[in-house]
């Protein structure tokens, strides 16, 4: 089973990736892990990627695609793989088609965990932190037991990280939507796209994913 897992920030992609990895004998390949492994191993492509990252520059597609091909060529992907964070552009998606064809490991499905952006703003911008001890809360999913009082230290002062403020969250989602939409269209035209309702209980989301994978595996 060869998959791509997609979803906007806050959609629960990380949680579902862990469940898929625990349930199916496939390699979970995240972009970050892939780059770190290549750099740690000191491969030619890993060194090239490091030279760009150290300068604060984007790693060019030629290098990224090469690292992806090296990773997918490893034996732990023979039983299947799940890509997480790649591809990010149509050019990368087209390169991936060539890579998987060369390796005879074609994609079986692209699973997109779909949650309305307004719901994601609530999920992502609801986090706040105790100034005294650093305990983390969420206004909807994990509020303090007593409003305005930290459960851990009894403090009454809280703050919100800049990354968690609604305006920042909305901008991050906008950027991701603009990036993901062409990819979703690309894979829909290929007949590979499966959309899961991410606005429900974690177990129900995973049940939908399992049903898709069972149907694809037939």
Swiss-Prot record:
It is found in: Cytoplasm. It is an enzyme of class 2 (transferase). GO terms for cellular component: cytoplasm. Residues 30-59 are annotated as: NMP. Keywords: ATP-binding, Cytoplasm, Kinase, Metal-binding, Nucleotide biosynthesis, Nucleotide-binding, Transferase, Zinc. The keyword Zinc applies. Residues 126-164 are annotated as: LID. Pathway: Purine metabolism; AMP biosynthesis via salvage pathway; AMP from ADP: step 1/1. Coiled coil: none annotated. GO terms for molecular function: adenylate kinase activity; ATP binding; zinc ion binding. InterPro entries: Adenyl_kin_sub, Adenylat/UMP-CMP_kin, Adenylat_kinase_CS, Adenylate_kinase_lid-dom, P-loop_NTPase. One of its GO terms (biological process) is AMP salvage. Its EC number is 2.7.4.3. ATP binds at residues 10-15, 127, 136-137, 200. Zn(2+) binds at residues 130, 133, 150, 153. It catalyses: AMP + ATP = 2 ADP. AMP binds at residues 31, 36, 57-59, 85-88, 92, 161, 172. Belongs to the adenylate kinase family. Consists of three domains, a large central CORE domain and two small peripheral domains, NMPbind and LID, which undergo movements during catalysis. The LID domain closes over the site of phosphoryl transfer upon ATP binding. Assembling and dissambling the active center during each catalytic cycle provides an effective means to prevent ATP hydrolysis. Some bacteria have evolved a zinc-coordinating structure that stabilizes the LID domain. Monomer. Catalyzes the reversible transfer of the terminal phosphate group between ATP and AMP. Plays an important role in cellular energy homeostasis and in adenine nucleotide metabolism. This is Adenylate kinase.
């Amino acid at each position: 089973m060869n998959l791509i897992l997609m979803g906007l920030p806050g959609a629960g992609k990380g949680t579902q990736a862990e469940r898929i990895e625990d349930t199916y004998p496939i390699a979970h390949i995240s972009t970050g892990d892939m780059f770190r492994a290549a750099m740690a191993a000191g491969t030619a492509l890993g060194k090239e990627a490091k030279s760009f990252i150290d300068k604060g520059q984007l790693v060019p597609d030629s290098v990224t695609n090469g690292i992806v091909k090296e990773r997918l060529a490893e034996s732990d992907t023979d039983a299947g793989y799940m890509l997480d964070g790649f591809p990010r552009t149509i050019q990368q998606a087209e390169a991936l088609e060539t890579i998987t064809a060369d390796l005879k490991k074609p994609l079986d499905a692209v699973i997109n965990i779909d949650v309305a952006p307004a719901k994601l703003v609530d999920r992502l911008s609801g986090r706040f932190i105790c100034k005294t001890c650093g305990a983390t809360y969420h206004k909807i999913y994990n509020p303090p037991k007593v409003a305005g009082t930290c459960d851990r230290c009894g403090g009454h002062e809280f703050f919100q990280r800049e990354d968690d403020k609604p305006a920042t969250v909305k901008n991050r989602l906008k950027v991701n939507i603009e990036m993901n939409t062409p990819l979703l269209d690309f894979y829909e035209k290929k007949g590979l796209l499966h959309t899961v309702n991410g606005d429900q209980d974690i177990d129900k989301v995973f049940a939908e994913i399992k049903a898709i994978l069972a149907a694809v595996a037939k």
